[in-house]
Amino acid sequence: PVTRVRYERERPGELIHVDVKKVPRIPEGGGHRALGRGCGSRRGAGTSCLHVAVDDNSRVAYAEQLPDERKGTTCAFMERALAFYEGLGVTVERVMTDNGPAYRSGEFNALLEARGIGHKYTRPFSPWQNGKVERMNRTLAREWQYARAWEGEDARAEALASFIERYNWDRPHSACGGLPPMSRIVGVNNVLAHN
């Protein structure tokens, strides 16, 4: 049996957990949650990829639903995630990922190296090592992805940004003593004001 060690980094940006999760697409007009399973013989709509980044200390999250998990897409997501954290006044020091091909690519590692950011990999088949982003994936599934019967993929994708904003600014988080994740950044080094 593996002993899992719980930890929390001392300051925002010290470690950002990053992961990709495949998400089934919803056909226009709604899927089986909206129409019921016996709605006809519709073909599957395929999948998209939910790219997620979570700060270890504050639990502030950034996520985008993108068409794939190729290295170009993953690098572009990482650029935007880093810009998001930098916009909050957070200096990212290190990123933790699994061993997926996009994260192992030279382009992804060059992007981090050019910014002076370290890259730590989890051990193969050890998702608990990246547990904070894995837990965020579960929260996204419960509170956004399957929270209601969506009428189509566009409606669900549009709701992601507002869910992430609500998660960061308003939703109580047990790791933050019942306060929202942004409470660990605001007043410390945040350069933005929430409306």
What label would you give each PLM region?
Residues P1-E28, P101, N109-A110, R123-P127, ...:
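Basic, flexible linker segments flanking DNA-binding modules
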Residues P1-V54, V60, A76, N195:
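Mobile-element integrase/transposase regions
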Residues V20, D56, D68, N99:
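Residues immediately flanking
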Residues G40-C49, E64-G89:
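Active-site beta-loop-alpha junctions of metal-dependent nucleic acid enzymes
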Residues R94-N99, E113-K132, R148-E151:
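RNase H-like polynucleotidyl transferase catalytic core
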